[in-house]
């Protein structure tokens, strides 16, 4: 059995930054550190940080006065931000800068009185945070997930209308929704640069290349990870058997026993140690040395807040 690895895969710059913010805050201030929502959608990462003293909460009211609070990489609404400001809390923002970019687009539209349409998945924390940037009562903010949603949508003023997208969507699906928006609302204005982030786009491109060669594709990522789900869906659309797994223990030998080639990738919130464990598991089932495919080089780095820019080893 051949083992192929997608490239790129795993952690993106936004996830790296968010985890570093929590780790550095724990090192500097000590436990407990409160984090609103899972800092990233990965069970291994969240469990590891929880063991070190991070407490994951959903409501600001759960945080005691005087505590350290961190917003997750998915971002928060203005209402949540204002609630935190009203409390005696030290707040650090781990929102991915590429999510913040979309927040700024929504806030700008709100100030101008333009109505805005967000392409995204209902209930996802990034969507809730992005929708929560719009505050103009004279306008409106709408959520669509599919072309069908677009055709049933009614807005107040088609002449002052813009759209944005969640950063972790399927590139292909989003293109279909944008096409529908432009047909339904010919004057609609989109972002100058695509809101789907570089990491999402690159990982979907990489899984396409992987699925062209592999019989079975394993995507390392948690069930609540939007970008990981999109990778598994893409491989399945290409006619491959694909499984979304949290870790190597999820793999069943029956999945791969007849496969000549198994492809492995990982969502943007999945650490490389999980991929290495998957490789080891596949080798138990007769897999050979893992071969990494050629792919796009990623060298983007997002800095942590200056208050947390320390060598963690100095405070251990």
UniProtKB/Swiss-Prot annotation:
Cofactor(s), names only, from the UniProt record: [4Fe-4S] cluster
Cofactor note: Binds 1 [4Fe-4S] cluster per subunit.
Record GO biological process: dimethylallyl diphosphate biosynthetic process; isopentenyl diphosphate biosynthetic process, methylerythritol 4-phosphate pathway; terpenoid biosynthetic process
Known catalytic reactions: isopentenyl diphosphate + 2 oxidized [2Fe-2S]-[ferredoxin] + H2O = (2E)-4-hydroxy-3-methylbut-2-enyl diphosphate + 2 reduced [2Fe-2S]-[ferredoxin] + 2 H(+); dimethylallyl diphosphate + 2 oxidized [2Fe-2S]-[ferredoxin] + H2O = (2E)-4-hydroxy-3-methylbut-2-enyl diphosphate + 2 reduced [2Fe-2S]-[ferredoxin] + 2 H(+)
Associated pathway: Isoprenoid biosynthesis; dimethylallyl diphosphate biosynthesis; dimethylallyl diphosphate from (2E)-4-hydroxy-3-methylbutenyl diphosphate: step 1/1; Isoprenoid biosynthesis; isopentenyl diphosphate biosynthesis via DXP pathway; isopentenyl diphosphate from 1-deoxy-D-xylulose 5-phosphate: step 6/6
Binding site for isopentenyl diphosphate: 41, 74, 124, 225-227, 269
Keyword Iron-sulfur: yes
Residues binding dimethylallyl diphosphate: 41, 74, 124, 225-227, 269
Record: residues binding (2E)-4-hydroxy-3-methylbut-2-enyl diphosphate: 41, 74, 124, 167, 225-227, 269
Database matches in InterPro entries: LytB/IspH
Subunit comment: Homodimer.
Role this protein plays: Catalyzes the conversion of 1-hydroxy-2-methyl-2-(E)-butenyl 4-diphosphate (HMBPP) into a mixture of isopentenyl diphosphate (IPP) and dimethylallyl diphosphate (DMAPP). Acts in the terminal step of the DOXP/MEP pathway for isoprenoid precursor biosynthesis.
PANTHER family recorded: 4-HYDROXY-3-METHYLBUT-2-ENYL DIPHOSPHATE REDUCTASE
Name of the molecule in the record: 4-hydroxy-3-methylbut-2-enyl diphosphate reductase
Annotated organism of origin: Salmonella schwarzengrund (strain CVM19633)
Lineage, opening ranks: Bacteria, Pseudomonadati, Pseudomonadota, Gammaproteobacteria, Enterobacterales
